[in-house]
Amino acid sequence: MTRPRRLAADHFRALAAAGLRTPIGTDLVLHERSDPEAVRLDGRRLAGAVQEAAERYRTPLAIPLMDLRLEKADLVHCVRPGVAEPDTFHFDVPPSDADLGRARAGEGASFLPAHRAHLDAIAEVAARTGLTPLGMAIGPFSLATKLLADPIAAVALAGRGVLAEDEPLVALAERSLALAELAVHRSLRAQLEAGAAAVIVCEPAASALFVSPRQIAQGSPVFERFVLEPLLRAKAELDEGGADLVLHDCGELTTAMVEALASRVRPAVLSLGSSRRLWEDVLLVPPDVVLFGNLPTKHFYSDETLPLDSVRSMTRDLVTRMRETAHPFILSSECDVLHVPEAGETIRRKVEAMLTEAA
């Protein structure tokens, strides 16, 4: 049964019209704590960091940590409980029917501590007034690539039309994607249950690095099969739960990829990396899809690479260009703004400039 929408249909467009600027910056606040790794495992304290980030950045959006390890850790724990280091685990043979069965049977199992804290933090924020509680999850394709030792070769073979029954690498990719979808949907349902009104689904692997633009141009359905169809199923999960999709892809994208993500998946918000010229991408994006991004915050740590004055000028330029397009737009970071030891104040100054520079 489909639940009522948790947000007004124009919620993000209204924020864009009001000129909202916000980084994905909770990691900076987390690392101001004396024990950030302990905070990651404590839902109440993690919610405090999320709320403090929203207050500092003057945004109504409660944006969680972009920790894309959570779903993989839970999945590996479910199907390979003896694995000590899930971050580095890869399947060396295609996941079996038994693996898929274990993943389905684990639907109601407890989440690992970091994932549990993430869910508890969403619930804590959702219980407070004045903030829009967002969730965060890795996308199905990006999770699948993390389950393979050589995802590029596997996806390339699939893109050439090689069948799973003829090539173990293709079977490995297809089976891993099926497992990834189960893990992502389980996470999405849990985040909706916790109170998320929208979920940021991160698909950085949906890019020219992992999916061949040449194969797509030649008519291969590889992007459709491995990226778009799983994303559409994830969006349907969110739609059924009454929540919006914020689709984040900071990978290197072609024009065709941007157009497909925007028009086929049609998220409420499309967040892109700094390689894209958003004022040109408006021609590819439906008018009701808010563009989000895309200052090069991965370089904020270095004054040599990206001086403060350059951040100010980039901010002015992007805001001005996007205003001229009249397309709904929220100025933000190209990805999550990560804490870098010894560069914290440098990064914070640039984030503040991004938020305050007049245009």
PLM feature spans:
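N-terminal small/glycine-rich loop or linker at the start of catalytic domains
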Residues: L7-V39, D74-P81, T132-E174, A205-R214, ...
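N-terminal basic, low-complexity leaders that serve as flexible interaction/assembly modules and, when applicable
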Residues: M1-F91, E224, L232-R233, V319-H327, ...
